[in-house]
């Protein structure tokens, strides 16, 4: 059983691994990304898919994707304040709701009939 795996949604996130969430400057007001990061939801979706393929090939009985949503890291149309890029969530926090990201759709494609 894999209890937690995931990736953020920006170019270079796979190389940072669990440190992907550290790209936010929380001392800024309002908080902002700490560099010129580029949103790429396919990075996150591809990583999850690749890992699930490995887990399946190795006979892993189950795996928990980290995580569904991170409300403290909301999406913004302004790339400097799109904290969702630093989120491991498969959906983005938008206002009081959420919207699916490419990773959500990939998981749905794989497991939607189960």
What is the role of each PLM region?
Residues 1-11, 35-47, 98-105:
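Low-complexity, flexible helical/coil segments
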Residues 1-33, 49-61, 70, 112:
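Glycoside hydrolase catalytic-domain groove-lining segments
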Residues 11-43, 81-96:
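Glycan-binding loop/region signatures in secreted carbohydrate-active enzymes
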Residues 45-46, 54-58, 66-114:
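Aromatic-rich peripheral "rim/lid" segments of glycoside hydrolase catalytic domains that contact
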């Amino acid at each position: 059983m894999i209890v937690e795996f995931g990736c953020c949604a920006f170019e270079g996130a796979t190389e940072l691994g669990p440190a992907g969430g550290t790209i936010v400057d929380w001392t800024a007001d309002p908080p902002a990304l700490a560099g010129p990061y580029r949103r790429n939801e396919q990075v996150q979706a591809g990583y999850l898919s690749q890992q699930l393929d490995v887990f399946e090939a190795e006979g892993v009985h189950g795996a928990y994707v980290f995580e569904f949503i991170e409300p403290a890291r909301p999406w913004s149309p302004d790339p400097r304040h799109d904290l969702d890029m630093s989120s491991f969530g498969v959906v983005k926090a938008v206002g009081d709701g959420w919207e699916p990201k490419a990773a959500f759709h990939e998981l749905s494609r794989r497991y939607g009939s189960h």
